[in-house]
Amino acid sequence: MPHAIDVHGHLLVPEANALTAGHPREAADAAAERESFNAHSIEINQAQIKRVFPQLTDVDQRLEDMAASQVTHQIVGPMPMHRYWAEPDLAYALTRTINEAVAAHCHKSPT
């Protein structure tokens, strides 16, 4: 069987998003996004995230999709969550949460 390696797999970490929910800078980022994209683009992006949520979070779904695509290995990393504004304690909590989530996700199927 040929090997195909996907080197750009996204992993969504809802627990990290929960850490910044309600933060004033999170609200400012959301407002900036609304200004950068038109309403139709935002609607499409939100629908897409909802549709692919299982692929972004569930190891079994990821493995099923990989098998269907003949992908034998995948490198996963957290989806862009640019929170450069986070104060040190929050940044530490975000980093720890994200790193632990990536490690747990990969541990379920490490090869």
Regions found by a protein language model. Give the residues of each.
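Helix-coil boundary/capping segments in enzymes
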Residues: 1-111
